[in-house]
Amino acid sequence: MNHTVVFNIRDVLSNIGYDIYLVTAPALANDSNATNIQRLPMKLKCTIGFHDQEGNSQQEELQSAITTTPDQMNYLLLAEDYKFPCSSFGLTESEPQVTLTVQTNVSSTEQRNRTFTRTMLIDCVMFVPHGISHLTDDRFEIEPHGDGDSYFWLMK
C-alpha cells in the first residue's frame, strides 16, 4: 500500500512564480545502522491543489514518478515558476487554499524486487520565489534579496 502525506500551504501570492522543492533525507539521517532495504530510493507522485478565481477546487499533477538518490539529501524540483491564480496571504482558513500532496508511487513488483521503498523521509517543502535559487550537483543556494548575500546548503 502506498502512503500519502498532505501539506497545507499558507500565504501564497497570486501571479508570482514559485520554484517548488521537496527536500528528502536519506535513511542514514534517521538511523546510522539503516539496512540496504531501508536505504532504497523513493519514487514519489506530487500533486498541487488550489482554489481558482471562482473558488473551485483544482488539482494539478506536478510529478508522477520523481525518484530520490539514496544516501544523500535530495532537493527535488517539483515545479519551476509555478503561479497560483489566487492569493491566500493573510487568510485564516478553515479549508486550506493550497495543498501539496506527496504520495509514494511504488508498485508491488518494485517493492518486492527491492527497487524502491514506500517509506517517506521528507525534511521539508520549500516555495521559493522564482529566480533566487540555484541548484547544482553539490549545493542548493538562495540569494533572497539580490544584495550579494546568499545562503546555501551542501548536498553531500
What are these model-derived regions, one by one?
Residues 1-156:
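Extracytoplasmic
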